[in-house]
Amino acid sequence: MQRNRSKRYRAAAQQLDRSKIYNLADAVSTLKKFPPTKFDQTVTVSFRLGVDPKQSDQMVRGTCPLPHGSGKQVRVLVFAEGEAAKAAKEAGAEFVGMKDLIQKCQEGFQDFDVAIATPAAMAEVRKLGKVLGPRGLMPNPRTGTVTDDTAKAVQEVKAGRVEFKLDKNGNVAVPVGKFSFEEKALAENGNAVIEAVVRARPATAKGRYLEGVTISATMSPGVRVDPAPYLNI
């Protein structure tokens, strides 16, 4: 069943040549010409990947620092004690603690965007799997959120490091900034994300990996991006 689209979306869709594939810079320029909204939309690069999400050895997951940040204020929670806890606080983490924070999360506290933990804390933090897991907040060594260097992890997240993960349909969607960003900043953030997703290609993936790439804003249609420049990374 066709979804009811807003007048703004339909106006943007009429401007877009859906048969055309743009280089990234032109795709961003096209996106920025769409009718503005009353709020600062998030801009997202979305991928359709040639992998089988049912196969554990074809999982695509990783992190990417955005050269120009995400434009979002990220609230960070850190499970740590001692010097690691002190370092996290000094780096700007909003919530730092151990047993008190674990209990708080068990009671339903979710007012944060990223959770970081020291390796020593993980024995206790794993008990929160059913709470943090469904929201994608469980600390993980592969995304740099399980580390003894809590200060560095907090600083990177605050500066605009984004995480990406393959969904059950074989897609990945990564925010690359805000609609208010300059075109150059959005293009450079987008380029960094595309390169990161390409480098995260599983060794077991066969055939074409980047089946489709689009860039869109919260209330806009997707603009197709040419994946050709990234195929030999």
Residue spans of the language-model regions?
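Generic N-terminal amphipathic, Lys/Arg-enriched alpha-helix
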Residues: 3-17
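Long, charge-patterned amphipathic alpha-helical coiled-coil/hairpin "stalk" segments used as oligomerization
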Residues: 93-198
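Residue-level signature of catalytic and energy-coupling elements of molecular machines
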Residues: 27, 88, 133, 215
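Flexible, glycine/charged-enriched surface loops at secondary-structure junctions
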Residues: 39-43, 200-212
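Translation machinery proteins
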Residues: 22-86, 107, 113
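Flexible glycine-/small-residue-rich
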Residues: 47-49, 80, 118-119, 176-178, ...
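Short, charged, intrinsically disordered terminal tails
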Residues: 1-3, 225-233
